[in-house]
């Protein structure tokens, strides 16, 4: 053990030893108050039982037995939340009700403990036979004609009421008038086949001797009471000590992990400095060191060198501004500032965590929006990234049609960004990284640069996947409803990195459909107006509607005939369909999708033209592309990602040389900062916030899953129906958990 481990062990011993001495229990005797409480409790429960028997055993002139209904305990909840309510299901029968109304059916009822009688058991009162029975068995079954009353009774201690039996209701007491009584403590233990009486032949004086219950407990009961608290104090004290020890161990482990992370960061810093020195000596471009100090969030208000704010968009949780950023170097640049309110703090922290992770790598990947800083300014949370004048892919496609060459560059660059996020070792990065799950891929979260390449943005719902840490928050049903994968809509996601990545791939397939649908294939082609995926079912569909359409009916966005017949675009259509396959395990990965798109786009000899026809394409079959799982000739792409943005262009065909060049940027900004929308603009779909996982509880009565709120409401309704006499579950077992408190 090293020196640090020894210090930690000594500290743990010094902390635990005083706690152990303080919490060690000392034997204590029962106080007079405890003794008096025990006496009063037993007296109350025995008085209740004697009252019940006195009502049952009343002799008339003929010597027969007249039966009255037993005093059933009131079914109610305890007002004090600290009092535990115990419930039990017992068989119910009343001879008087049978004689009066003719309802002689044996039913079942649920009873609850109440007041100071903390427990409740099942009860049977029956008549003892007057004739001698020729049997040597100590206990005999009680026949139905002997039943006087079946139900339940509250009690304080099972031993004083002879309720220790669990499997059957066996006679423990007899009373004057030839009446026997038994008590048991499990559900339905007083069923007809389980009621037993003492053989009167073996105890002839049972009818003449009254075994009445005492009004005070015996000396043995008081002695057992003296010992009872001592054992419980030991158990409770040891439990407290164990909990404290576990908390201390957890804290020590957490501190150890923090120290370990700091040591790893120091080693990475030393390694980075060595790599930077080697790069300078070799004459290469020096590596960029992550600016960790600049992006640390502070709780105190501070100012950023950002001016000239111009509103771009706003929503329920924040606003996005175009602004001018002037760092210490004095070189001004346009940035996008996303200002979030307090309700979106979790989204801010999640996005900042992703950018912190990406900022630790030696270089920034060009298919991810470039990060500037993240700060808390006043009561707002700011995320500052690079600004792109073409705004989002959604804005571009909604207002313009594009050429095939523009579509090629858009599709290639956005899938390039997704494969970078997902893969441990991306194609053109050269460094290992942790997988990142975006969880909200859509056309609004993909920005279009001036050269028609794209970058992925908005990481408020993204998570870093760690193979050695369980992350239950990845199972939440989050994202934009119309872009949710079938398994997300169905709530049947596997807890594997492949399954989480497949959800992003599905969403990216829908974005590819949006791009291809707005692509002009030839001079006379007229693409239809922009439509969001699944717009046929409404602008703001519910989760249930999406589940029925996508999961049950397996519907997908429809292709227009021109796309299906077009030889070049039909292969991109096939890749898209493989990305939105209903089965998550059958979808291709983002890396595979990029390889197929790259090989298809870069293999066309006439890809630099504005439009493609079947005759101008290289005759390349789909099967040939499917066999190429890795991009071919990717040296240009590697150089592109290794260079600065201004030194090398994207290796895909340049859309600005097309006969149908890209549309100009969107400069339509009003004086108040809002984007000018056309008159027939569609309403924006709502996004689902990152909600916590809803606990689902199984209800046996309905064989369905419900939330705790739904189940509490259902439980209250059942209780009202029961108290009103509307219970119709006669002769059938009441499902466990139907009454009382539901637990998971």
Curated annotation (Swiss-Prot):
Q: Positions of the region Disordered?
A: 605-686, 724-744
List all annotated glycosylation positions: 60, 134, 165
Subunit description: May interact with daf-1 to regulate dauer larva development. Interacts with sma-10.
Query: Which GO biological-process labels does this protein carry?
Result: BMP signaling pathway; cellular response to growth factor stimulus; dauer entry; dauer larval development; defense response to fungus; determination of adult lifespan; egg-laying behavior; innate immune response
UniProt topological domain (Cytoplasmic) ranges? 275-744
Here the segments flagged for biased composition (Low complexity) are 731-744
Q: Which UniProt keywords apply?
A: ATP-binding, Cell membrane, Developmental protein, Glycoprotein, Kinase, Membrane, Nucleotide-binding, Receptor, Serine/threonine-protein kinase, Signal, Transferase, Transmembrane, Transmembrane helix
Residues that span the membrane, as ranges: 254-274
Entry's family note:
Belongs to the protein kinase superfamily. TKL Ser/Thr protein kinase family. TGFB receptor subfamily.
Catalytically driven reaction(s): L-threonyl-[receptor-protein] + ATP = O-phospho-L-threonyl-[receptor-protein] + ADP + H(+); L-seryl-[receptor-protein] + ATP = O-phospho-L-seryl-[receptor-protein] + ADP + H(+)
Q: Which protein, by its recorded name, is this? A: Cell surface receptor daf-4
**Function, please?**
Involved in a TGF-beta pathway. May be a receptor for TGF-beta-like ligand daf-7. Controls the decision of whether or not larvae enter a developmentally arrested state, known as dauer, in response to environmental conditions. Regulates body size and male tail patterning. Involved in regulating entry into quiescence triggered by satiety. Involved in sensitivity to CO2 levels.
Q: What is the lineage of its organism?
A: Eukaryota, Metazoa, Ecdysozoa, Nematoda, Chromadorea
Query: Which residues make up the binding site for ATP?
Result: 312-320, 338
């Amino acid at each position: 053990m090293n020196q640090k481990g020894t210090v930690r062990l000594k500290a743990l011993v010094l902390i635990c030893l005083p706690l152990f001495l303080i919490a060690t229990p000392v034997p204590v005797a029962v106080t007079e108050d405890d003794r008096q409480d025990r006496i009063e409790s037993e007296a109350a429960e025995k008085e209740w039982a004697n009252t019940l028997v006195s009502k049952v055993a009343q002799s008339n002139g003929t010597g027969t037995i007249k039966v009255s209904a037993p005093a059933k305990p009131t079914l109610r909840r305890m007002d004090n939340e600290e009092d535990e309510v115990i419930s039990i299901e017992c068989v119910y029968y009343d001879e008087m009700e049978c004689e009066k109304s003719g309802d002689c059916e044996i039913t079942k009822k649920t009873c609850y403990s109440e007041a100071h009688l903390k427990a409740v058991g099942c009860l049977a009162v029956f008549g003892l036979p007057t004739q001698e029975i020729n049997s040597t068995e100590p206990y005999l079954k009680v026949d139905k004609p002997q039943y006087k009353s079946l139900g339940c009774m509250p009690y304080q201690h099972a031993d004083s009421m002879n309720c220790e039996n669990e499997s059957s209701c066996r006679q423990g007491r007899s009373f004057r008038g030839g009446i026997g009584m038994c008590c048991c403590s499990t559900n339905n233990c007083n069923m007809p086949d389980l009621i037993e009486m003492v053989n009167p032949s073996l105890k002839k004086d049972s009818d003449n001797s009254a075994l009445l219950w005492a009004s005070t407990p015996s000396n043995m009961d008081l002695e057992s009471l003296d010992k009872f608290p001592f054992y419980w104090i030991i158990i409770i004290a040891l439990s407290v000590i164990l909990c404290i020890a576990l908390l201390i161990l957890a804290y020590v482990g957490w501190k150890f992990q923090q120290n370990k992370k700091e040591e790893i960061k120091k080693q990475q810093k030393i390694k980075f400095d060595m790599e930077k020195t080697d790069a300078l000596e070799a004459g290469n471009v020096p590596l960029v060191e992550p600016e960790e100090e600049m992006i640390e969030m502070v709780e105190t208000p501070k100012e950023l060198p950002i001016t000239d704010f111009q509103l771009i968009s706003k929503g329920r949780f924040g606003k996005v501004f175009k602004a001018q950023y002037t760092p210490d170097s004095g070189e001004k640049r346009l940035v996008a500032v996303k200002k979030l309110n307090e309700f979106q703090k979790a989204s801010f922290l999640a996005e900042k965590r992703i950018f912190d992770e990406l900022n630790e790598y030696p270089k920034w990947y060009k298919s991810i929006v470039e990060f500037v800083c993240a700060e808390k300014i006043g009561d707002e949370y700011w995320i500052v990234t690079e600004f792109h004048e073409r705004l989002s892919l959604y804005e571009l496609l909604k207002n313009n049609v594009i050429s095939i060459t523009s579509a090629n560059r858009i599709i290639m660059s956005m899938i390039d960004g997704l494969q970078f996020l997902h893969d441990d070792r991306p194609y053109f990065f050269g460094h290992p990284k942790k997988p990142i799950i975006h969880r909200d891929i859509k056309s609004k979260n993909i920005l279009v640069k001036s050269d028609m390449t794209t970058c992925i943005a908005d990481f408020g719902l993204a998570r870093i996947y760690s193979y050695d840490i369980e992350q239950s928050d990845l199972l939440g049903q989050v994202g934009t409803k119309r872009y949710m994968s079938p398994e997300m809509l169905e709530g049947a996601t596997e807890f594997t990195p492949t399954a989480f990545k497949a959800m992003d791939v599905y969403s990216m397939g829908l974005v590819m459909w949006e791009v291809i649908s707005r692509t002009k294939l030839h001079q006379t082609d007229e693409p239809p107006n922009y439509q969001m995926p699944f717009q046929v079912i409404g602008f703001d569909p519910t989760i249930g509607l999406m589940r029925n359409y996508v999961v049950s009916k397996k519907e997908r966005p429809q292709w227009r005939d021109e796309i299906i017949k077009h030889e070049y675009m039909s292969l991109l259509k096939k890749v898209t369909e493989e990305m939105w396959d209903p089965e998550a395990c059958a979808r291709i990965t983002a890396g595979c999708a990029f390889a197929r798109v790259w090989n298809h786009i870069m293999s066309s000899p006439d890809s630099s033209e504005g439009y493609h026809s079947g005759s101008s394409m290289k005759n390349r079959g789909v099967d040939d592309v499917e066999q190429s799982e890795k991009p071919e000739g990717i040296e240009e792409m590697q150089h592109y990602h290794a260079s600065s943005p201004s030194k090398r262009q994207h290796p895909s065909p340049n859309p600005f040389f097309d006969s149908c060049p890209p549309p100009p940027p969107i400069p339509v900004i009003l004086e108040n900062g809002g984007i000018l929308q056309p008159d027939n603009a569609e309403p924006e779909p709502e996004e689902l916030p990152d909600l916590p996982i809803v606990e689902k509880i199984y209800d046996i009565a309905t064989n369905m899953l419900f939330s705790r709120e739904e189940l509490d409401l259902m439980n209250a309704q059942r209780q009202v129906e029961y108290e009103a006499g509307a219970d119709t579950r006669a002769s059938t077992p009441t499902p466990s958990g139907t009454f009382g408190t539901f637990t998971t």
